[in-house]
Amino acid sequence: SNSVLKLLLCIIEIDYSFWGGKLAGKLDYYRKYSKDLIATISISSANGTTSQKLNNAEMLNSGIELEVGSQLDIIGKDIQWYGNVNYAYNLNRIERLFVTDNSAKTYLRGDFKEGENASTIYAWHYAGVNKDGIPCVEEGSSPDGLRPMNTVYDNTSDATGWLRPQGVKVAPHIMGLTTGFKVYNFDLSLIVTGKFGHKFKRSSFNYPTMGKTGTSKIWVHKDVSKLLDGDKAMPPLLTDTEDSNQMYYDSYYTDAMDYLYHNANHIRFQELNLTWHIPEVWLQKIGFRTAAVYGQINNLGLITANKYKNDPEFPEGTVKPERSFIVGVKFNF
């Protein structure tokens, strides 16, 4: 073995073609083991800090990439159909990472964890109110397993198992489809993409500190109606008293609750294009070699898997791509 090798890579590729090329494509399998990746690891406090970003992590990446393409003559070369599908799947896992700090903050900020996917999401689970009427989350260091949400969570103990894994934020399954018809001098094409197997965090009521700080702002969100209706799936508002410590609500808990994470599967209709290629006999009279008139629509629509109909890639409060229309002419002399 090579002790200084930083990357172990295995790639298997299969190219195929059937029925005279009417169905063709390729299948790739890869398995990559990477060493000396940059990550935050634990070091001796004698260095003046207990953690440092160093080249000391190891990760396994494996997956497949599939391409399938076809072109069929329906009526000779005058009417044709074509299509191409691309699919990619990736699985990664942190194989080696030396850390001694597994406190709650490391899970909430997305630090790598040995044995887990690099993009695993962790969140608090709301456990209802305690006997004093204070909303609580599950936390292992408390005697009853509950942490009141108006107190700071234990950030010194090992928090393994406290926060629940919600899935991954990077889609492991990605698909793309390009298909179209050629009908005499007209071309009609469609581009569709899809991402599957991951989660996204939707926006919600932000539990502000009710104006007690200069930066406190209330987000006018429809979820506030659930609070007013007493929805037990969400933490209620704390009573506005001096000892309620409302600042802990939005600072430590309510922005990282498991009920905020939802299925991010979606299919996006990216582009529809119609092109008319002007007949050559017409072009010869005006001295053009080729010319075409086209119309295109971008961002046609979206199919989502979450009940809120949120766009997983452009959550509420961000700028979403608007549907656009393009008409143009292209030609060669």
PLM region descriptions:
Residues 6, 22-26, 173, 197, ...:
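N-terminal hydrophobic signal/anchor transmembrane helix of membrane proteins
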Residues 13, 159-162, 174-177:
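Short, hydrophobic/aromatic alpha-helical segments in well-folded domains
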Residues 38-42, 63, 149-157, 242-251, ...:
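Active-site-adjacent bridging/hinge elements
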Residues 54, 71-169, 200, 209, ...:
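Conserved small-residue
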Residues 56, 124, 192-196:
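Long, contiguous hydrophobic alpha-helical segments, chiefly transmembrane helices and signal peptides
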Residues 166-203:
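Glycine-rich, aromatic-lined ligand/substrate-binding cores of catalytic
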